[in-house]
């Protein structure tokens, strides 16, 4: 029965993505929704290559949120769009760049002038000198790998435009209700019916891409010992050539415990008594219950900085785990936006509260 339900869910997801691709290809707008465990919000989305003053005005009048343009890193580099801040500590680390206007614009705020700016961002032959900074359009840089890395509207909208053959820039705007609060699932259904728009979920796009793509590959597999415990070691490389290691302890089942940890030099780990003891505690628990310790090469020693676990989710999926007991060093660990990978967090456990 679960397999049938899963197949039906996948079928519906593919239908929604195919419809959204066709809408984007025709220059229409769609509503894109993220997971309930993330922002749980909907954005109006259309391909920047199809921008018009009328579309910008519709977003400003009916969606009411911040009008942004999601772009690839390649576009940002070509137009010399630097990050808005050096240290991004926003909730979901949304990658805003410095705001921009078209150089030929007057104030830059009208629908027509914002459309001028959007067209420059979408034009593959445009030059950074055509823009002035700051301005009234907010570019956002999508992570390389798209929604398979970060399950956000920025990545989902760029993925959708690419799938539709409309380049890698999308205009997006959050949808708010008349009272100024954010529109949620029931509100978005009403919004779509009123404006005759189709809806697509970012998890749908993840599922659609996962049918034919993977950003990870196994480069080695061996039986070994880790800190004195028998384990199966898996070495992975992702699309950015980052190296990740998974140690599987005990009997790995569909439902298993998972602990994420940053890759760090042995001397640093041993020098940090708190982290070392926490790791030992986690390994005891994983061996007893059956689970996986995943060392992520994420460029930071602070795992709390990882708000999206796209690569980690693919590693978990590769190991045959779908229902996760998430081990962490605190009660506030996030593992969001993973339903498109066919995963569910069924329990969160504080490592420090487990009994070795």
Curated annotation (Swiss-Prot):
GO terms for cellular component: cytosol. The keyword Transcription regulation does not apply. Pathway: Cofactor biosynthesis; riboflavin biosynthesis; 2-hydroxy-3-oxobutyl phosphate from D-ribulose 5-phosphate: step 1/1. Keywords: Lyase, Magnesium, Manganese, Metal-binding, Riboflavin biosynthesis. One of its GO terms (molecular function) is manganese ion binding. It is an enzyme of class 4 (lyase). Catalyzes the conversion of D-ribulose 5-phosphate to formate and 3,4-dihydroxy-2-butanone 4-phosphate. In the N-terminal section; belongs to the DHBP synthase family. This is 3,4-dihydroxy-2-butanone 4-phosphate synthase.
């Amino acid at each position: 029965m679960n397999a049938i339900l899963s197949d039906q869910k996948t079928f519906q997801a593919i239908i929604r993505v195919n419809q959204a691709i066709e809408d984007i290809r025709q220059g229409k707008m769609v509503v894109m929704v993220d997971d309930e465990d993330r922002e749980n919000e909907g954005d109006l989305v259309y391909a920047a290559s199809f921008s018009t003053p009328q579309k910008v005005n519709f977003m400003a009048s009916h969606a009411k949120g911040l009008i942004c343009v999601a772009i690839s890193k390649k576009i940002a580099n070509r137009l010399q769009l630097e990050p808005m801040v050096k240290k991004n500590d926003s909730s979901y680390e949304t990658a805003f760049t410095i705001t921009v206007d078209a150089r030929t614009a007057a104030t830059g705020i009208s629908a027509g002038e914002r459309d001028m700016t959007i067209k420059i961002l979408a034009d593959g032959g445009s030059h950074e000198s055509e823009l002035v900074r700051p301005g009234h359009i907010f570019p956002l840089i999508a992570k390389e790998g798209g929604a398979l890395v970060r399950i956000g509207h920025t990545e989902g909208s760029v993925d959708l435009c690419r799938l539709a053959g409309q380049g890698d820039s999308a205009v997006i705007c959050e949808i708010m209700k008349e009272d100024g609060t954010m529109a949620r699932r029931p509100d978005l259904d009403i919004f779509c019916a009123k404006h005759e728009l189709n809806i697509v979920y970012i998890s749908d796009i993840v599922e659609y891409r996962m049918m034919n793509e993977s950003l990870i590959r196994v480069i080695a597999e061996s039986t070994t010992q880790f800190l004195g415990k028998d384990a199966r070691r898996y070495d992975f490389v992702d699309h950015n050539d980052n190296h990740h290691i998974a140690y599987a302890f005990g009997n790995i089942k569909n439902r298993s415990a998972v602990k994420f940890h940053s890759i760090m030099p042995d001397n640093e780990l041993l020098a940090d008594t708190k982290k070392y003891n926490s790791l030992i505690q986690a390994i005891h628990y994983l061996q007893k219950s059956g689970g996986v310790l995943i060392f992520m090469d994420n460029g930071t020693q602070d795992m709390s900085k990882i708000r999206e676990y796209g690569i980690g989710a693919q590693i978990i999926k590769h190991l045959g785990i779908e229902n996760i007991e998430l081990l962490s060093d605190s009660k506030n660990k996030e593992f969001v936006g993973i339903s498109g990978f066919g995963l569910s967090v069924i329990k969160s456990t504080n490592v420090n509260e487990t009994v070795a």
